[in-house]
UniProtKB/Swiss-Prot annotation:
Binding locations of substrate: 11-16
Species this chain originates from: Parabacteroides distasonis (strain ATCC 8503 / DSM 20701 / CIP 104284 / JCM 5825 / NCTC 11152)
Protein name, entry field: tRNA dimethylallyltransferase 2
Metal-binding recorded as keyword: no
Phylogenetic lineage: Bacteria, Pseudomonadati, Bacteroidota, Bacteroidia, Bacteroidales
Subunit-level organization: Monomer.
Residues bound to ATP: 9-16
Gene3D superfamilies (alphabetical): 1.10.20.140, P-loop containing nucleotide triphosphate hydrolases (3.40.50.300)
Molecular function GO terms recorded: ATP binding; tRNA dimethylallyltransferase activity
SUPFAM superfamilies in the cross-refs: P-loop containing nucleoside triphosphate hydrolases
Keyword line: ATP-binding, Magnesium, Nucleotide-binding, Transferase, tRNA processing
Residue(s) at site: Interaction with substrate tRNA: 100, 122
Catalytic activity: adenosine(37) in tRNA + dimethylallyl diphosphate = N(6)-dimethylallyladenosine(37) in tRNA + diphosphate
Family: Belongs to the IPP transferase family.
GO biological process terms, semicolon-separated: tRNA modification
Length: 299
């Protein structure tokens, strides 16, 4: 049976180098499951694989979208499942790596068939969010779908807005489209989680932010600043520097905020991943143990 090896873990843990070693060991390409590496022109802030790394191993789902393109976990599921059906014709084991929790779950479990939202409805809601804030949109969700209102992370404006988009477009509660039925995949899924001691991970995150700044993150963010309203740029590393460009923060404060928000995101990732009993955890330096585990799983 064909296999999909998923190397996952928090930001900054060291997934990239290990994924290259695993891919080379099993003769596999790498599929990125990082929701921001999909976009062009953001290689530094998204820690995208370098040209040298992409020369070592063929990569997919990296630098394929414009900043203005709308893309969701549902799109990712469709694209990656289709890609795997082609790759598995000649490559029995394929590696996927990244830390975008929803994207990984989309490939492993599938996403319910939610209607596609029209640009007019999406634009209207984001305009309302920009002018009025999230409170009236939350109130609309509570009225239209009290079940999902109780379940959704009400601080996550993207999820709140998406639910209201569906309610407006269909006239039905967003929750009515959710079945929570796991889809069957025609391949074995092997999940390997990477984690480090908390202090070690925090130090790596801080050092990585400093390295990104030395490699030109400030200039990369400045080029993206005219597009700051786009969802593709509502991400750690850019939104903080946008506050510096607007005069709201000093550069030192913006950099400290990037480090802090990256650490917070890493904790959120681990909270999500720790709920999954299918993940076998390793320290990234335990390469031989990881290879042994994978060799036993891939038959």
């Amino acid at each position: 049976m064909n296999s999909l090896v998923i190397l996952l873990g928090p930001t900054g843990v060291g997934k990239t180098e290990l994924s290259l070693q695993v891919a080379e060991r099993f003769g596999s390409p790498i599929i990125s499951s990082d929701s921001r590496q999909l976009y062009k022109d953001l290689p530094i802030g998204t820690a995208a694989p370098t040209p040298e790394q992409m020369a070592r191993v063929k990569h997919y789902m990296v630098g394929t979208l414009s900043l203005t393109d709308y893309y969701s976990a549902s799109n990712f599921e469709e694209d990656v499942v289709s890609l795997l059906s082609e790759l598995h014709k000649t490559i029995p084991t394929v590696v996927m790596t990244g830390g975008s929790m929803m994207y990984i779950d989309a490939v492993c479990k599938g996403i319910d068939d939610i209607p596609t939202v029209t640009p007019e409805i999406r634009d209207a809601l984001y305009m309302q969010f920009e002018t009025e804030g999230l409170a009236p949109i939350l109130a609309e969700l509570k009225e239209a779908d009290p079940v999902h209102y109780e379940e959704v992370d009400r601080n996550n404006y993207k999820r709140v807005i998406h639910a209201v988009e569906i309610c407006r477009m269909t006239g039905k509660p967003y929750s009515s489209f959710r079945t929570n039925i796991k889809k069957e995949r025609p391949f074995r899924i092997i999940k390997v989680g990477l984690n480090r001691d908390r202090d070690e991970l925090c130090d790596r995150i801080n050092q990585r932010v400093d390295q990104m700044m030395s490699e030109g993150l400030l200039e990369e963010a400045r080029r993206a600043y005219p597009f700051r309203h786009l969802n593709s740029l509502n991400t750690v590393g850019y939104k903080e520097l946008f506050n510096y460009f607007s005069g709201e923060w000093t550069l030192d404060l913006a950099v400290e905020k990037i480090k802090r928000n990256s650490r917070v995101y890493a904790r959120k990732q681990m909270t999500w991943f720790k709920r999954d009993p299918e993940i076998t955890w390793f320290h990234p330096d335990e390469t031989e143990a990881i290879f042994t585990h994978l060799s036993q799983q891939i038959i």
